[in-house]
Amino acid sequence: MPREIITIQVGQCGNQIGMEFWKQLCLEHGIGKDGLLEDFATQGGDRKDVFFYQADDQHFIPRSLLIDLEPRVINGIQNSEYRNLYNHENIFVAEHGGGAGNNWASGYHQGEQFVDDIMDMVDREADGSDSLEGFVLCHSIAGGTGSGMGSYLLETLNDRYSKKLVQTYSVFPNQVETSDVVVQPYNSLLTLKRLTLNADCVVVLDNTALNRIAVERLHLSNPTFAQTNSLVSTVMSASTTTLRYPGYMNNDLVGLLASLIPTPRCHFLMTGYTPLTVERQVNMIRKTTVLDVMRRLLQTKNIMVSSYARTKEASQAKYISILNIIQGEVDPTQVHESLQRIRERKLVNFIYWAPASIQVALSRKSPYVQTTHRVSGLMLANHTSIRHLFSKCLGQYEKLRKKQAFLDNYRKFPMFADNDLSEFDESREIIESLVDEYKACESPDYIKWGMEDPGEANVVAALDSKLVV
């Protein structure tokens, strides 16, 4: 029985990457832009109903909610060639259409105001599912709507659907270029608190690394949002491929995540993908073997998180877990040989306190999408170097907070009224504790470290109850 997943796209960034994701899914399942199955899509063997449901007129409709506080991006989707794909009852745009002004507090406050309307849509989708497995949230952590309203929805989903999994695809801001959102460090910190406490799994999409990959690997001198979004949609579709083209393992979300996340707080995953191509670069052809793909996935330059730094401290960082999803016509014996070769050459540095093994899921490629390569691979990895990304967010926050800069923008809203800034302090403590925990994972006695925190047992129990299938 398929375990359905409801996708919630929040804010400008969330809706843009969500749109690219649905375009990719339509291509892979042979679904036309209007939601009707293409004449050639007769092979079957795929599970369309994990992400789509079929209407009475045979249209395939995404199990998706499109939410924004300003209309520009959603209007663009409604005027695009995919306008008939979505269920228009599942589109929410705030009446005043003024957005959240890149202010987390505004997005969160409006989340409270509109929660009944949005949760009605969520409940309707959930009631239409036979065996709902969980939710996927697409958003960014730096702006106002995706971060603030996304945070409120995470808390609400966690409360109302406590037994369902919540996975997020969270876009982290570019740390190299100067941002046009001056309060980005505040927004990021407040959102990170919710991602730590209210999500079961966060796939980190780091704009710094995505831009670097587009420049260095794809040779695009000035990558556009559309090009980096196409990288994101590639990762999103590849990470769900075992759910949609099921094999004998990893064919539901619980199965995917249980092996990657041994401890509840350390649930931030980084990704790598190979071979990468964009439309203007299809003429580059090379021989892809399983070993070649698996070796490339471990190379720093293919990893889509910039915290994977080339410093001495980063060399001590360790993998907590790795899952490689290999797509294509692959002989399982090749996989076994490749894993042996990687082990012999000590290409991977694992933690001391858990099994040091790379897990591999084999998946069929979509018969409807032609690619120039025979084998492709996605790596989902839980790696302790991700803490450097959080440390950067903390550092940027401290700079602003020291100067008391832009805090008046937040004091206008109930959570920060009467100069109550305790929410910032609490968020900072939680992220500092997260950084400490990832650092502690690198030592052999991490298990004892976990026992020092009396609240840890409760958190473990909460996650365990979700991972009982």
From Swiss-Prot:
Keywords: Cytoplasm, Cytoskeleton, GTP-binding, Microtubule, Nucleotide-binding
Broad class of where this protein is predominantly found: cytoplasm
Gene Ontology CC annotations of this record: cytoplasm; gamma-tubulin ring complex; microtubule; nucleus; spindle
Gene Ontology biological-process entries: cytoplasmic microtubule organization; meiotic spindle organization; microtubule nucleation; mitotic cell cycle; mitotic sister chromatid segregation; mitotic spindle organization
GO terms, molecular function: GTP binding; microtubule nucleator activity
PROSITE patterns assigned: TUBULIN (PS00227)
Cellular compartment(s): Cytoplasm, Cytoskeleton, Microtubule organizing center
Keyword Translocase listed: no
Pfam families the UniProt entry points to: Tubulin, Tubulin_C
Binding locations of GTP: 142-148
Domain of life: Eukaryota
Function as written in the Swiss-Prot or TrEMBL entry: Tubulin is the major constituent of microtubules. The gamma chain is found at microtubule organizing centers (MTOC) such as the spindle poles, suggesting that it is involved in the minus-end nucleation of microtubule assembly.
Family recorded in the similarity comment: Belongs to the tubulin family.
Protein name per its UniProtKB record: Tubulin gamma-1 chain
Gene it is expressed from: TUBG1
